[in-house]
A protein has these predicted regions:
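Short beta-strand-to-turn element immediately C-terminal to the catalytic PLP-Schiff-base lysine
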Residues: 129-130
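Conserved alpha/beta cores of soluble small-molecule-handling proteins
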Residues: 1-118, 134, 140-195
Length: 195
């Protein structure tokens, strides 16, 4: 089973084309036909139409489940570096491997996964590092997220090799995903990344 998370902001479906493309690429890779995306706005409960909503679609050949919930961003004040090599090139509904890695976060709020000393992603987001007025995202991601792709296309961020040894070159780290943009300011100083 696979998972697609789509942001609906005050009744507007954001970046839908990128999500459809990812579903189609996933289906092609695993040799099934991607199910069509239903009219999510018509399914959206009335009480959620004036807020930011997290829509989760679990699918394979057919949609197995569609859910909507009011979005509440996580409060992240520290990240723990965790060396691992999970296979997450496709957005699997089964996140056991990532949940297992979260058990290693210690006192931190979230993990920052590394692979051979290269920075990748958190357990729920891609990351962007600020260096002065420039923004960089690791070229060693686990999941090439739709928001990451959008920001790269727009030229707002640049891909770069980022290592645990080069973290001191940056001032802050932003967490981005379908629900979070750089402008949402879910960020923290790199000094809050724990070794």
């Amino acid at each position: 089973m696979f998972l697609e998370t789509i942001c609906i902001d005050h009744g507007e479906l954001l970046n839908a084309g990128a999500h459809i493309t990812r579903m189609q690429l996933t289906a092609a890779r695993f040799r099934f036909d991607a199910p069509p995306l239903p009219d999510l706005l018509s399914l959206l409960p009335r009480e959620l139409r004036d807020t930011k909503v997290k829509c989760r679609i679990i699918y394979r050949e057919t949609q197995q489940d569609i859910s909507f919930e009011k979005y509440q961003p996580k409060r992240i004040q520290s990240l723990q570096l965790v060396e691992a090599a999970p296979d997450y090139a496709y957005k699997y509904a089964d996140r056991k491997e990532l949940i297992h890695l979260l058990e290693r976060k210690g006192e931190a709020d979230e993990i920052l996964i590394t692979r051979g000393g290269l920075i990748t992603d958190s357990s729920f987001s891609n990351v962007v590092f600020r260096q002065g007025n420039l923004f960089f995202t690791p070229d060693s991601w686990l999941l090439n997220g739709t928001k990451r792709q959008k920001l790269l296309r727009e030229g707002r961020i640049t891909e770069k090799r980022i290592t645990t040894e080069s973290l001191h070159e940056y001032q802050s780290v932003f967490l981005i995903n379908a629900m979070l943009d750089i402008g949402d300011m879910v960020s923290l100083p790199v000094s809050r990344i724990l070794p």
